[in-house]
Amino acid sequence: MGNFTYLQQASNKASVAGSSLTSSTANSSYPLSNLQDDKLSRPFRTTGISNQWVEIDAGSPINVKLIGFANHNFSSTAVLTLQGGTVPNPGGDSSDVLETITWRSRYAFKLLTNVQEYRYWRFNVDDLNNTDGYLEWGLNILGLSTTLSFNFNYGWGWADDYENLEHESEFG
């Protein structure tokens, strides 16, 4: 049994106007400002693969339940974490939150157990096995999620039905 959970683009606190972004490194051809663009095809890119981060200053505390990365090039051994805090460079205060995000191909995300409220959010990536020599992603995911009030029934499913329609004319 599974639930369907989503975050609308307009509700993504990581890409709204008014929040400011800083990063450990940035490739000038793929600037940090691309993360505030709705187009996944215009990614942000780092210049390294180890200890890379993007920090979001939301301006004021925001409620978050869904976190993640969209359209990334991370290897399956990448260590992905999110830190939330009340001061820049969160992680030093015992009240700060630290969440590990499970790697998934192209989209890595996590639905938090409880809503977290902080002003500063830092996405950390450490990917020593990345053969590209850089880290790239199109969007940070940060916000409240919507979970439908119903879920899938056990045993119920669907299957794609493909038909290959072929018609040979009388001349081949």
Set out the residue ranges of the language-model regions.
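Extracellular beta-strand elements of beta-rich domains used
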Residues: I67, L139-L142
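Short, surface-exposed beta-strand/strand-loop-strand elements in extracellular ectodomains
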Residues: S75-P88
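Disordered, acidic Ser/Thr/Pro-rich linker "stalks" and the adjacent N-terminal cap
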Residues: M1-G59, S145-G172
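Beta-sandwich interaction modules
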Residues: N51-I62, D96-L139
